[in-house]
Amino acid sequence: MRLTLLLTALSFLGYSQIEITELKTPQKPSTKLSKYIQQNQNDSLVSQSIGSVSNGSLKNGKLIPFQGKNFSYFDETSYLSGRAFLNSKVLHTILDGYKNLETTQPNRTFKIMECAHKNGGKLWPHRTHQNGLSVDFMVPKLKNAKPYYGLDTLGINHYWLTFNNQGQYNKDTSITIDFESIAEHLLTLKKEAKKHKLKIQKVILKVELKDELFHGKYGKKLKESGIYIVKSLSPTINALHDEHYHVDFKEI
């Protein structure tokens, strides 16, 4: 599966690693991107998630903003290919969560990865993401105890990155996953989801990373929060969830 993702990625863009410890000011969207956003403006209709995350569809899907004050979508090609739509409740949950993180993590910028098609259905090669209740989030990273963004510019190629069981990037172990940032983000999502009549159904992250995730202050709170983080995965699925964490929401 990871090889399939790599081949797909290489068809979009070339692989390169850039040393970036601070993100630049968001650039003005390209003409093509601006036109796409204009054509897909969100309306006030409430979304309907039909079926399950692995066998479902989406009605009145909403396009997530390509960028905001402290977040952006990870890949323009994916965005323009119609892979960044969500249930309206999930969209509001995510945006409200990032608004809170502007205060609690003021020096951190986040990346949203693939979501769903506007009408849901199969989102190749994902097994879920079919009814607008699934979202992939890029793992935040550190280098020398500072937020690091040098790998965040790879677009779809980011799905091909690998991290060891301690959360260190395989090609440069000085680059590590910021587990405390992830833990706080998940706790924030839980709080905001409740306001929008949602709950976090499950979180998928490489199971060997859970000890690191639960180690810090927010990690300990996460462990006691009741958020279900999967305990076992098939080898293929497990290997694919080291550089991002997947969240499935459920309507309540």
Residue locations for each model-derived region?
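N-terminal secretory targeting signals
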Residues: M1-S57, G61, L233-P235, K250-I252
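Catalytic cores and adjacent binding grooves of peptidoglycan-active enzymes
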Residues: I20-P29, K146-I252
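Active-site acidic/histidine clusters and adjacent loop/turn architecture
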Residues: N42-I112, I177-K194, K199-I200, I204
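Short, solvent-exposed beta-strand-terminating loops
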Residues: V46-N55, N60, V139-L151, E212
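Extended, low-complexity, intrinsically disordered C-terminal regulatory tails
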Residues: T93-W124, K202-S232
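Envelope-exposed proteins and targeting segments
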Residues: P106-R108, N131-V135, H241-Y245
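Soluble periplasmic/extracytoplasmic beta-strand elements of cell-envelope proteins
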Residues: K111, S134-P140, I204, H246-D248
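Acidic/His-rich structured neighborhood in mature extracellular/periplasmic domains
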Residues: H117-Q168
